[in-house]
Amino acid sequence: MVKLESPAYGFQGTARARAQAARWLLIGLVPAFLVCCAKTQSKPTIPAGNARFEFLTPSLVRMEYSPAGVFVDAPTAVVQKRDWPAVQVQSTQKEGWLIAATSAITLRYRLRSGPFTAANLSVTWNDPAGAAHAWHPGDVDPLNLGGLTYSLDNISKPNLPEGQMDLESPVNDMIPGIDVLLAKAKPGLLSRGGYAFIDDSQTPVWNAHRTWIEPRPQQNGQDWYLFTYNRDYQKVLKQYAELCGPIPMIPRYVLGPWITDFNFEYFPDTVESGQPAFKRYNQRYLQDEVSRLRQNLIPFDTLVLDLAWHNYGWQGGYDWSPLIAHPDELLSWLHSQGVKLSLNDHPGYANTEESILSFNDSHAPQVLKDLGRPLPPKPSFDLDISKLWSFSTDPHDQGLSHHWYATDHAEGRWKPIRIGLPWQDQGYRTYQGVGWYRASVRLPAKLPEALYVYLGEVNKTYRIFVNGKEATHSRIHWPRRLTYTDIAPYVKAGQQNEIVLRVEPGENHGGILRGPVAIRDVAPPPRIYFDLSNREQAEVFMRDLHEPLMRQGVDLWWVDGGSGAVDMPGLNKQLWTNKVFYDYTQQETGRRGFILGRYGDWGSERYPAFFTGDAYSQWPVLAYEVAFSARGGNVLVPYISHDIGGFHGAKIDFDLYARWIEFGTFSPLLRMHSAHANPREGNMRMPWVYGSQGIALMRKYFTLHTQLIPYLYTYTWLAHKESMPILRPLYLQYPELEEAYQHSHEYFFGEELLVAPVLDPSGNRTIYLPPGQWIDFFTGRRYQGGTTFTAHYAVEETPVFVREGAIIPEQSASEYSNAKPLDTLILNVYGSGKGSFDLYEDDGDSLAYTEGQYARTAMTYASSSDGFHNLIIEPTRGTFQGQGQARSYELRIHAADKPSSISVNGREVGGWMWDAGQAAAVVVLPRQSIRDRMSVTWR
């Protein structure tokens, strides 16, 4: 259960949250001091000098080596469980070897031989056919089916060359030539070799006294886990979840569609921020966008604000930008529309020294006080020079050789220029050569001893000259990139001073992009940084910067990076950043946690979900994402969120836009996003960009995704309880079927639906269907399984197939996922055969499910050889807050012959409808108590 995660972190939340955290602490930190020496023993730990072996299950073994003989019994940042049931182990010593065997594996270690190597350690086992298998330290598994990587940032066809695959990753998993990012990914848990290996040697351990993590007492030990399972893939996923922590339940509303906007930066007091486009693209624009989606009957649940909600840019502020003039009103209005709000955050982005907090942010004084750091000195001399500049192009790059930086220069065609905009936006749109800036500044007769020129953000490569001499310059990250230079040695008091800047542009933006542009007597203060592996700093970070926004009404956080905000040896920085955000928000609110974060390797399943990053809008990228999502199940990451439509790409072709939405519809998380959601372009992922065709397509698929939430939410429970991913590769369902390993661009969505998204502009799709009978989800057409076929799908169609006999529950169409109580449930049954579904429900938001407050409703469907079909809805089991006590059902019978009669609980009913084109019957069943059994029969 989630309680095994344990750390309360010392964060202060609600009384209920603190009590819950205390329970986690008590339950999750029971050490397992188990030492056994008998030849046959039920205690699973076997000491062997400086080595120790612990058999957690008959097929899962922990192997530790410590040069100092100091072993770890506390949980770590990755491994949560230490108290395991007894395992029968037979151990002997023979000719200097320790031999320990369970019913599943045999371990051999040469005693007193030092750290584990291929020469002194092995684990062997047999598969069901009796074939022997062996593992040794250092083995490379070419049969591993692959894991995930930190992100898919900037993935595109050109930057994915062939021939750079890691041997530890599958070579036949993707479209040839675009799978290089797998080389950065570690192997997953699933392998046709029948084993998985986790190295936990370096990760920090939990200190129960300090209630926080700390580095391992020694960094040169070995702490390994080996899972053996043959082809029982579900077994290894369940054991991994037991070891490293289960997938928690997520808020139900996050399964509804998401819209992202505001992908641009806001810096106050710049020329750009004062442009009319910025004044239009604001709070009112967002409300109009939401209203327009509602007016077009396009359901969605969550609005995400990207960079521009921050004042001082995406790496510098937690104040609202002036574009959100009345955030309380916006939050209240969004919540009245059934819309949740998520904000983007970049804590310690990209492992650089870029600022986490600007000194200009209103939170800075309190943060510095709480961190015990001094306030920076304020300048006593502050001369604004932003309006003194002229500019000249240098297309032949002759300015240096002709001494344009000299005070007596005569060349160049100098014209006035504004600071705060690239020169491309000031009449030099196509110019990409060297540019020169010049300002003549008269300084007073009396100057302070220290003097610095601030030149804001200069893009990109530059040199600074003062009175004809080149000055040594600095660049600090505050709040993004601030150029400043000590000019005291070069200036002349009481005279005109020439400041010259030579700039080589970067990409499409060159020059002084934003301020401050001034001369001051103090250097810029260093960044305000946080180390989230430090308990006190983590608490200040969340309490001072995030808690006020959460209390204002912000619902969840998009943790867009975090690899630079943590500093502890052996700790995965992204994993810990995700944990800090997830646990703090859960403890502060007393409700379920949820974040959009990057992937943090082992243990990431505990902190859903995984945002994959800024990919390009290309067909091969869409194909990559399909197989990548399916592979997420290999490391037990069920909630993967791609930028639907791709990030880098403005108005993409409609067929690519449509196919991406179709893929997103049959994914747990459906989130539209683009780099092109800004004042100049508008939001290029909105459906009206494509006119009525785009609106109709988004309405169709967003509505379908929302209606499927009862089905999908049941699988979130199974992900939590049974450790099974929602989006599953074919081989997870059919591990012994060779064809299941050859179709990585198909996947199961739950157990009943098979999805094969269209991946190229032709609309053609070659599809493999596993054995059995299958039915087209949209048309009702039947297919024989165990075959491969090719079909064409129009742009508004997508290949989805239902296993015959399946029961697929849906809810009624609505503006957002929880707009209506689930007092009417649509039940879709398909064809003949047998099937079952055990519907899961709870309050959708609280942690009460951990205390057993939820409900299940079992449904079974069966067909007989004499043409009778029977659906049984059993009485609902269990209760939860807000549970409805009565329900009606709308039964939809697909891929069937027209019934001659339909009866409910033995009484024939009329009024049902028959759709000959769809070969489907629809009957509305009478409303009754959820505690009553219902039987529906037709023939």
Predicted regions and their residues:
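A low-complexity, Ser/Thr/Gly/Pro-enriched, surface-exposed linker/loop concept
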Residues: L56-E95
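Catalytic and substrate-binding clefts that recognize carbohydrates or anionic sugar/phosphate headgroups
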Residues: Q93-R284, V290-Q295, H792-S814, K820-D823
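Aromatic- and carboxylate-enriched substrate-binding clefts and catalytic-loop regions
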Residues: W135, P299-P379, P505, H509-M698, ...
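An acidic-aromatic loop/edge-strand motif
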Residues: P377-D425, V491-A523
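Aromatic-lined ligand-binding clefts that engage carbohydrates, nucleic acids, or primary amines
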Residues: A406, W414, G433, V441-G468, ...
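Solvent-exposed beta-hairpin/edge-strand motifs
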Residues: G456, K460-V466, Y768-T779, L891-E908
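Beta-strand-rich ligand-recognition modules
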Residues: E457, I464-G515, W912-R933, T937-W938
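Catalytic core of carbohydrate-active enzymes
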Residues: G603-F610, E625, G632-H642, G649-F868, ...
